[in-house]
Amino acid sequence: MKNQNLLWAISGGRCEYEGCNTPLYMDILTKKKYNKAYIAHIVADSLDGPRGDPERSEKLANEISNLMLLCDPHHTLIDKDVANHPEDRLVEMKRKHEER
């Protein structure tokens, strides 16, 4: 839970996917508050997941450096289109978003 709260804080409660920045805590039209966020793993938390790694998956599972806050479409995209979303690209997206 501690890392989840930290992730929300450092992401500003917005999707970390490049070019998105959608608020994940409220509807932008109605301003109604809710949680639309997905916490995604850069390196999968299991070997058979997207970008899974036999040596690092378990170790990185809950590391803040391995977690991204994403909207539903981008959470689905990074896991279905792994070839275009390698670890280094996701790490760079996260870095750029969190440095803003």
Spell out what each predicted region is.
Residues T22-L67, L77-R95:
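Histidine-centered nuclease catalytic patch
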Residues C15-C20, C71:
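Short cysteine-rich clusters marking metal-coordination/redox-active sites
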Residues M1-G12, L24:
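A boundary/linker detector
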Residues W8-E16, E63-L67:
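Short metal-coordination and nucleic-acid-contact micro-motifs, chiefly zinc-binding Cys/His arrays
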Residues E99-R100:
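Charge-rich interaction segments
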